Amino acid sequence: MTELYPLTPPGPSRRSTLRAAGGGTLLLGLGLAGCRSAVSDSSSAPQGASAASQRGGVLNVAVNADFTPALLFAQSGQSLQHRLIYNTLTRYDDRLRPKPELAASWTYAKDGRSITLRLRDDVTFHNGRKFSADDVIFAVKNLQNPVRAAQLRSTAATVTGFEKRGDHELVLKLAHPVNNLFDLFEFMIITDSETVEDAVTGKKLIGTGPFKLKKWSPGSGLSLTRNDRYWQAGRPYLDGVELRVIAQADALISSLRSGQSQLSFDVPGKSLGAVKNDPRLAITNYDTGAGAVYLGVNTTVAPLNDRTVRQALAWAVDRDRLLDQTLGGYGLASAAPWPKSSPAFTEANRTHYTHNPGKARQLLKSAGHTKLELPLLHLALPGDTAIAESIQYDLRQVGVHVTLQPTDGATAQKKLISQGMPALWTMGHGFAQVQPSTLAVSAYPFNEAKNTSKYRSAEYTKVVQEAWTEPETDTAAANALHEKISSILLDEAFLIDLVVRGRVQVTADRVHGVTLNKFSYLNLDHAYLV
């Protein structure tokens, strides 16, 4: 057996903070190259370390879209509440090393066909029921249920057997080895099995997390209150959290500036320049690529069934302009989905497609087209609309005229899951920030078995399956498979990546200790107000 925990302490965080100081900003280059990311001057300590932790207060979080209960297990665009109400089995540090949460320790079999989890024995659900191995079994089976539309369902499905060794030790038996099991453990929220059907309608959200649901007001947001029986002693510091829906960008920014809201991840890129000049607000860039911007292509709609036409679109978009003018400079212009923190990243793949409208027109002409008219679906939110308009402008320059289709988030997510997208769409994707294999076996836009673009390829499936089951210890073989996946994605262009970016966090200067997990679940265990 191979013991995977305890591990060495985590290294420096890949997050970095940019704090406004009057009318100017001091940038110290501690971020990843190509990402707009820095720390403040030496007089400011990192968030969470600048003052003594204080108990009490309610944190108001401004979000631009409401929680969608039906997508609780699918990871929608608004998943902040997941780690507030629930816990996961493990959590990654910034080097993708798993750390304990509800699983206190674990032992992986040498053949990769089973893992033994030793669970915490001091955890209770919000309704007073004790957490046990049965809850982990339920959580895995719940994600295996196709009704839940979980993007990590394929990984959950590799668990084919369970062996309980008492209430707090569990062996998961796998159909075959996979190298992204801890991605599943970070993604999979542990819900109360007795009320799960009420959870997906928003009636009851019962977990083991630091906050309990007080009220969900559809269209207005979530009201959470402190869990006084939380298993982490003395946590959380906050008395409560309010997730307030503020759909209009100007109103959201005004809420932050006035102090009505103290935290948001939804300030549009175009507005970040104004925000960073406010000395009362700080910008933190999570630059490990949890939310890349892309142009999706339905490969069953003519002439997009022609790879040459899809490649023309990839050459047509000005990624650098999109990044600078629409996203506020936060991110990395990239033709490939990988952040620089990923083992799959290469500079050659990042720059495989650059802005070349002449080449785009030439490819379209070679395919017999000088003018195309296509629909382009996008989320009906200010930041997403600006992205769609930027893409629309670039495509028009090469003779591709698109009609924008603004769509609410819940409807767009359902279309993404059901393969119901029109010819073109633009949204954001995650899953490139964890194990590279997870992107191609889990994320709806990339899934080798069933993706939104309706692209199928025996070669793609073969390479993805090999990458998924390749032991992490064989770095050279794993990297070779990652390169094959990247080559197929770039050559086939059924999904056209534009900018790799993480979540951009705006906080009031009185907020400390805010973090996100790899799937953008908000963690406020150690957060406090001063």
Residue spans of the language-model regions?
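Surface-exposed binding/hinge segments that line
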Residues: 118, 152-194, 215
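Extracytoplasmic/peripheral linker and loop segments enriched in polar/acidic and small residues
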Residues: 401-406, 410-412, 441-508
